[in-house]
């Protein structure tokens, strides 16, 4: 089993290190992650400048390779030129903070998994629901459990899976739930500040609260103490509007 690891918090992030340690006994692990934090980068590719790859020489990250680009850059480079042997699985994370509902459209963590899936590799994104890295050891155990299940019972086709893990001690996690994406309210307003030169700076506001956290959603499962596993697809076609659009065009 050859697993490619990536993330969006950067190669120095604790979530990547513990994920690497948890999965190392399962096979060959290749780490290619961003040099810097790229949270919220979504599926962006770097097209206006060349990219470079470096290797960490010390610490728990020794042997990790990192790219001066985005999470999608990392997986794209790995699968389209850097790795002679394609991995069997792409794993992204563990992210600091949830990726539920519409978060998946913005998340660099999910985007790294999406790139693996687009290039024909089964892919999984792991996120902790709350920030702060509390109970990261439990999240790593959950990630290993999921990957072991994938190895033991591989799906028939490439898949894209989004996993959100409650920040709880492992023994307090109630189990696993197959879920759909919930929905959020619109993001909160931008935050404005005036710098010493009198210019107005803008900070993107916090994500909106959940507005659909009903039973069966990722929000509901995580809030109840369960690990949420959501299968994702990339076809954004609104099929229910095709006939109406066709009539509108006539």
From Swiss-Prot:
Its cofactor is a divalent metal cation. GO terms for molecular function: 3'-nucleotidase activity; 5'-nucleotidase activity; exopolyphosphatase activity; metal ion binding; nucleotide binding. Gene3D superfamilies: Survival protein SurE-like phosphatase/nucleotidase (3.40.1210.10). It comes from the Bacteria. It is found in: Cytoplasm. InterPro entries: SurE, SurE-like_Pase/nucleotidase, SurE-like_sf. It catalyses: a ribonucleoside 5'-phosphate + H2O = a ribonucleoside + phosphate. Its EC number is 3.1.3.5. Keywords: Cytoplasm, Hydrolase, Metal-binding, Nucleotide-binding. The keyword DNA-binding does not apply. Belongs to the SurE nucleotidase family. NCBIfam families: PRK00346.1-3 (NF001489), PRK00346.1-4 (NF001490), surE (TIGR00087). Nucleotidase that shows phosphatase activity on nucleoside 5'-monophosphates. This is 5'-nucleotidase SurE. It comes from Cupriavidus necator (strain ATCC 17699 / DSM 428 / KCTC 22496 / NCIMB 10442 / H16 / Stanier 337) (Ralstonia eutropha). The gene is surE.
């Amino acid at each position: 089993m050859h697993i490619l690891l990536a993330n969006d918090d950067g190669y120095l992030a604790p979530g990547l290190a513990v994920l690497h340690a948890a999965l190392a006994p399962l096979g060959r692990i290749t780490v290619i992650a961003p040099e810097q934090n790229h949270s919220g980068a979504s599926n962006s590719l770097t097209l206006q400048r060349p990219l470079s790859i470096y290797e960490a020489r010390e610490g728990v990250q020794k042997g990790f390779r990192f790219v001066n680009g985005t999470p999608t850059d990392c997986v794209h480079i790995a699968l389209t030129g850097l790795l002679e042997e394609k991995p069997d699985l792409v794993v992204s994370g563990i992210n600091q903070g949830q990726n539920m509902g519409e978060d998946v459209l913005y998340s660099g963590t999910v985007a790294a998994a999406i790139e693996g899936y687009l290039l024909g590799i089964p892919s999984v994104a792991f996120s902790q629901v709350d920030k702060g890295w509390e109970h990261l050891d439990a999240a790593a155990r959950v990630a290993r459990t999921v990957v072991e299940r994938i190895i033991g019972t591989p799906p028939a086709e490439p898949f894209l899976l989004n996993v959100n893990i409650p920040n709880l001690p492992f023994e307090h996690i109630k189990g696993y739930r197959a879920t759909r994406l919930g929905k959020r309210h619109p993001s909160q307003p931008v935050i404005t500040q005036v710098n010493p030169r009198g210019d107005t700076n803008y900070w993107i506001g916090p994500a909106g609260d959940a507005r659909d956290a009903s039973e069966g959603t990722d929000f509901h499962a995580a809030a109840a103490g369960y690990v949420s596993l959501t299968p994702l697809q990339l076809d954004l076609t609104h099929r229910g509007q095709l006939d109406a659009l066709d009539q509108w065009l006539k």
